[in-house]
């Protein structure tokens, strides 16, 4: 906890400036506080703030089965904490409520778009699809093209926590931003922030799914919001995904093995970010030119026609990551990678895995259908790969993937 989790519960004394201690707030005061928290959240740019209790018992069986099947791959931290992920009060002692927040991350310019030769503006999702279809393009997931979201989200959530403290005095709390074993989608759904889509991401009617989630675990018994009706099956009354299965069909590697179930071991986001070693050879051709993460399941989702622009400039594209080529990024030195990825979520995978991912993309470019790339582009790719292979400092991991890529030369 950022502060003693027992303090606000055990201490019934008013604060020195006359504010009531959190444990002394009556129902009306708690309701007013919840309303203010949501207003403060809007001021901080959050698209939605919701409050839930800590009962996630309905998620425990599914979590246990998913872990038992090994679908978490090398993400051992998911199994390490066991059922604490589904038991907020065990993860952070004293927790009574969870505040869930949603922050849009699409760069503002993305939704505006650039006019084509005829002056028409293409839907931004069509532009993203066009880059994925270009064998020479390096595709970085939209969320990772700007500043590291962990920092942006954490700072805003901490500011929100400080506003609460200024209102009621010291209270037990802890901020989470995809940095601990938290079932954030279940918590957000329970708090009425959205519903779990078949791709397992949270969806919201007026915002789609291109947003981050963050939480504040608190020891204050705020009134809980009504849960968003889950889409458990197409025939469920009020279902929000209905019979749509576009995300399942769009997944390049078939990682969405069933509605609401992802096998991370096949997911491109896992393979390019979480996996430390060699990417399984049968999956490499399916990755295409996606070098950090994957947005395919979101791009085809009908709800994302309502995706919102980020309220902050932190997520604006840096270093041309929305238009860079595979060769361009592959030729970065280790020093250039460290310098340019400073403050980016990409930096955490390190230079070695960055090159590994790019080598796979270059190999897939060489394997593109006839006419996919011209002879000059092909020659440039081969030259870049061979230059890396000639580097005596190249790691065994990178060398393996470069050699695989060159087998298509």
UniProtKB/Swiss-Prot annotation:
Start and end residues of each 4Fe-4S ferredoxin-type domain: 232-261
Residue numbers annotated as active site: 178 (proton donor)
One of the Pfam families matching this protein, by short name: QueG_DUF1730
Cofactor binding note of this UniProt entry: Binds 2 [4Fe-4S] clusters per monomer.
Subunit structure and binding partners: Monomer.
Cited function: Catalyzes the conversion of epoxyqueuosine (oQ) to queuosine (Q), which is a hypermodified base found in the wobble positions of tRNA(Asp), tRNA(Asn), tRNA(His) and tRNA(Tyr).
Name under which the protein is recorded: Epoxyqueuosine reductase
Biological source species: Burkholderia pseudomallei (strain K96243)
Gene from which this protein is expressed: queG
């Amino acid at each position: 906890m950022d502060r003693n989790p027992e303090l606000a519960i055990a201490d019934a004394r008013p604060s020195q400036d006359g504010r009531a201690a959190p444990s002394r707030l009556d129902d009306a005061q708690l309701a007013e506080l919840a309303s203010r928290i949501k207003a403060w959240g809007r001021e901080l740019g959050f698209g939605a703030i919701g409050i839930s209790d800590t009962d996630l018992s309905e998620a425990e069986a599914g979590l246990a089965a998913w872990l038992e099947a090994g679908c978490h791959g090398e993400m051992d931290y998911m199994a390490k904490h066991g059922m604490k992920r589904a038991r907020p009060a065990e993860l952070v002692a004293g927790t009574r409520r969870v505040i869930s927040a949603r922050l849009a991350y699409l760069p503002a310019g993305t939704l505006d778009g650039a006019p084509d030769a005829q002056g028409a503006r293409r839907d931004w999702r069509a532009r993203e699809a066009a880059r994925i279809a270009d064998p020479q393009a390096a595709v970085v997931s939209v969320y990772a093209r700007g500043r590291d979201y962990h920092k942006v989200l954490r700072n805003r959530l901490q500011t929100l926590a400080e506003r609460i403290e200024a209102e009621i005095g010291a209270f037990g709390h802890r901020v989470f931003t995809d940095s601990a074993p938290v079932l954030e989608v279940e918590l957000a759904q329970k708090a009425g922030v959205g519903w779990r889509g078949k791709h397992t991401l949270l969806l919201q009617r007026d915002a789609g799914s291109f947003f981050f989630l963050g939480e504040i675990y608190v020891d204050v018994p705020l009134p809980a919001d009504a849960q968003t009706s889950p889409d458990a099956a197409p025939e469920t009354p009020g279902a929000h995904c209905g019979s749509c299965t576009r995300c399942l069909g769009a997944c390049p590697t078939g990682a969405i093995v069933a509605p609401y179930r992802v096998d991370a071991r096949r997911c491109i986001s896992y393979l390019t970010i979480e996996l430390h070693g060699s990417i399984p050879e049968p999956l490499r051709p399916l990755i295409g030119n996606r070098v950090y993460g994957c947005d395919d399941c979101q791009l085809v989702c009908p709800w994302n026609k309502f995706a919102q622009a980020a309220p902050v400039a932190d997520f604006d594209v840096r270093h041309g990551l929305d238009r860079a080529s595979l060769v361009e990024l592959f030729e970065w030195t280790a020093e250039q990678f460290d310098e340019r990825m400073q403050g980016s979520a990409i930096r955490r995978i390190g230079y070695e895995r960055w090159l590994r991912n790019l080598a796979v993309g270059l190999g897939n470019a060489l394997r593109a259908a006839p006419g996919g790339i011209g002879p000059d582009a092909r020659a440039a790719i081969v030259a870049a790969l061979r230059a890396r292979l000639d580097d005596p400092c190249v790691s065994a991991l990178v060398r393996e993937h470069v050699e695989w890529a060159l087998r298509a030369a």
